[in-house]
Amino acid sequence: MKKINLILILLIFSCSKNDTLVSQDNTQNIDPSPNGLNLIWSDEFDVDGTPSSTKWVFETVPPNNGSWWNNEEQYYTDRRENSIVENGVLKIIAKKENYEQKSYTSARMTTQDLFDFKFGEVHIKAKLPAGQGTWPALWMLGKNHATAGWPQCGEIDIMEHGDGNPGLVSSSVHLANSDGNHYYLRGEQIIENESSDFHIYKLKWSSSKMEFFVNDKRHHVFNVNNTMPFDQPFFLIFNVAMGGDFTNGNIDPNFLSATMEVDYVRVYQ
């Protein structure tokens, strides 16, 4: 898939408003390097098997008395049944099964302590899981979250899906106000074929603002100032949760499994 895109690029050179509908076209698969920026980190998922241990770590220990936050219902594992690279694509697989006193399993992968960065662009080409109750997310946390706590460390949600509308994807920025209380701002887009086609989810992050895109259609801009925690390094997180507050707690009773596929993730500065 990525090799075909490169060939297409070589051939070429040799010859916000919410609920904006993003249509599917052939150009969405071509993702050249942004002008003036250099690729500083990527995973093309070209080696089949377990995701690279030099780039990813698995979070498997629930932090909230045996559960994850937001009333989620999954147990995250590092098993190949829940995360694997096959045919050049990372697959994070949510499954209905009894495991460690939970009814669902999935995976949560991060680059914590392996890679973090401040400012630049993140490009992620992904196909989202289908099914009511799945909550896929491509997002980031501040490197200092262990000491500063959340939301003081800041959170950048490049893409979330599962808010009850099959085509709705959203991007959010979470932080604390002057009283230490959590608040967030969100932008949304309606896209077609989110679970059958790959789309490119993009963050542009500078010292003054963050911009969020799907297939180069911008749907959210967040202005940054020096009182906010977005002038420090952040690390990446990929996961598929089940149920939880974001999905209104509704899981299809006939759900068996669903997969988020990631063709690549690239970070530029």
What are the roles of these predicted feature ranges?
Residues 13-14:
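C-terminal motif of bacterial Sec signal peptides marking the signal peptidase cleavage site
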Residues 19-269:
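GH16 jelly-roll
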